[in-house]
């Protein structure tokens, strides 16, 4: 939208995808904005921004492998007591229904990319442009591994959790001088 002197735009989005197995999903939010302002024939400036926030739940990364290794005759619960079985004694496989509820992995990320510029035309055919483009990213990763998982083997070691966070900032600053001339060829 806008006028001859000011042009602007804004958009946003949302995306959600359910995973094939329990506790897997992906969610993303994004925003975009842009503005261009012309003060007069000598000065203009503007900027743009694009931001994305995403959350990815990875669930239990051993789940499908455990399901494919199980015999079709193995029951998730004891046929005698009705209790959940977390590890089968005959083949040392783990019950994927129990391990899937005791292990989680999540990744959150925020990405922000923007640009601001100033364009000056002091004389005809000469343009001086300066633009600054920062890029910021933040990633947080976390894992929870409960007692009833392959890693912990149901021992008294207790559950484990870990979290990491990574931030990164980079930028590009361009200064451009552009002079345009026309050369005509006459016959």
Where are these regions (language model features)?
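Residue-level signature of outer-membrane beta-barrel architecture
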Residues: 1-4, 14, 37, 49, ...
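Surface-exposed loop/interface segments of Gram-negative outer-membrane beta-barrel transport/assembly proteins
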Residues: 19-113, 129-187
């Amino acid at each position: 939208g806008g006028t001859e002197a000011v042009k602007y735009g804004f958009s946003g989005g949302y995306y959600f995808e359910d995973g094939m197995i329990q506790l897997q999903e992906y969610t993303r939010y994004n925003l975009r904005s842009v503005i261009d302002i012309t003060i007069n024939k000598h000065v203009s400036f503007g900027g743009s921004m694009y931001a994305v926030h995403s959350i990815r739940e990875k669930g239990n990364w051993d789940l499908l492998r455990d399901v494919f290794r199980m015999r079709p005759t193995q029951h998730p619960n004891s046929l005698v007591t009705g209790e959940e079985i977390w590890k089968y004694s005959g083949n040392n496989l783990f019950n994927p229904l129990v391990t899937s509820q005791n292990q989680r992995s999540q990744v959150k990320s925020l990405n922000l990319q923007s640009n601001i510029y100033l364009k000056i035309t002091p004389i005809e055919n000469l343009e001086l442009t300066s633009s600054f483009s920062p890029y910021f990213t933040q990633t947080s990763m976390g894992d929870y591994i409960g007692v009833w998982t392959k890693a912990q083997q149901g021992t008294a070691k207790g559950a484990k959790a870990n979290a990491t966070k990574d931030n990164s900032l980079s930028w590009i600053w361009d200064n451009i001088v552009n002079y345009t001339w026309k050369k005509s060829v006459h016959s």
